[in-house]
């Protein structure tokens, strides 16, 4: 990786999130609004680290002895992209050298957020589990998502709803859906 592609703060933390590797748990809850971070972390047994840089607020602590990090992404897919790239860098890049680590790590990411449609039968602050997501800005085309791309539903939307702009539909992985559908979080 070119050093210009990964900007660090003077303290060695990643630029936007102001996090270092040791500040990050392997389980990360992502929320949009920075005020939602406190709504979640007020239930933590212990807080070990807090930081904020503009809309990016991060808190790491423990809940029932499980270490968790909560990060706010701000608004929009481009902000989420920044957050995910910096989180990935924290676990898969040597921040001193900029070299990709030989052993790659995956984070457990859980997105908790609001949807664009509120229905009378769904109370505010309810938890919903989505089986599909629709990308309206084409941002996800930057990634290889062929394993979850739902081309038939995308075609249906385009043909039956006279949508001019291209939409892309992605399925939640069945493994992830089944895990959350059968577990009380």
Name each model feature, range by range.
Residues 1-175, 179-182:
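Metabolite-binding pocket within alpha/beta catalytic cores that recognizes anionic/polar moieties
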Residues 185:
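Short catalytic/ligand-gating loop segments at beta-alpha or beta-beta junctions
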């Amino acid at each position: 990786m070119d050093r210009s592609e990964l900007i660090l703060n003077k303290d060695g933390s990643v630029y936007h999130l102001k996090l270092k590797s040791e500040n990050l748990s392997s389980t990360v809850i992502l929320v949009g609004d920075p005020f939602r971070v406190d709504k979640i972390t007020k239930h933590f047994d212990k807080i070990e680290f807090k930081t904020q840089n503009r809309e990016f607020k991060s808190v790491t602590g423990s809940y029932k002895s499980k270490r968790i990090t909560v990060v706010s992404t701000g608004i929009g897919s481009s902000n989420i992209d920044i957050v995910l790239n910096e989180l990935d860098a924290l676990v898969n890049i040597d921040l001193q050298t900029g070299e990709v680590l030989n052993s790659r790590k995956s984070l457990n990411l859980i997105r908790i957020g609001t949807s664009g449609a509120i229905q009378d039968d769904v109370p505010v602050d309810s938890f919903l589990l989505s089986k599909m997501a629709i990308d309206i800005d084409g941002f996800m085309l930057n990634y290889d998502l062929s394993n979850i791309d739902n081309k038939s539903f995308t075609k249906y939307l385009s043909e039956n709803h006279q949508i001019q702009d291209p939409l892309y539909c992605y399925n939640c992985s069945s493994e992830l859906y089944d895990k959350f559908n059968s577990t009380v979080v």
